[in-house]
């Protein structure tokens, strides 16, 4: 979406992607959720002492 609309602000891209996400069924979301869990576990293993600090 960002490549198709290079002048669009990140906040607008996030809103549109969020709206598209809400339209997906649980089955369509499942691969992304599973991948997110896998990546989170991998990150926790590689960086056990990591603390988010904004």
Curated annotation (Swiss-Prot):
Its main location: nucleus. InterPro entries: HMG_box_dom (IPR009071), HMG_box_dom_sf (IPR036910), SRY-related_HMG-box_TF-like (IPR050140). Keywords: DNA-binding, Nucleus. One of its GO terms (cellular component) is nucleus. It is found in: Nucleus. GO terms for molecular function: DNA binding. The keyword Isomerase does not apply. Residues 1-54 bind DNA. Pfam families: HMG_box (PF00505). PANTHER family: SOX DOMAIN-CONTAINING PROTEIN DICHAETE-RELATED (PTHR10270:SF324), SOX TRANSCRIPTION FACTOR (PTHR10270). This is SRY-related protein CH4.
């Amino acid at each position: 979406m960002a490549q198709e609309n290079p002048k669009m602000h990140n906040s607008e891209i996030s809103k549109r992607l969020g709206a598209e996400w809400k339209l997906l069924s649980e089955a369509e979301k499942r691969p992304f959720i599973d991948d997110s869990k896998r990546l989170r576990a991998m990150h926790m293993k590689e960086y056990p002492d990591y603390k988010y600090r904004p």
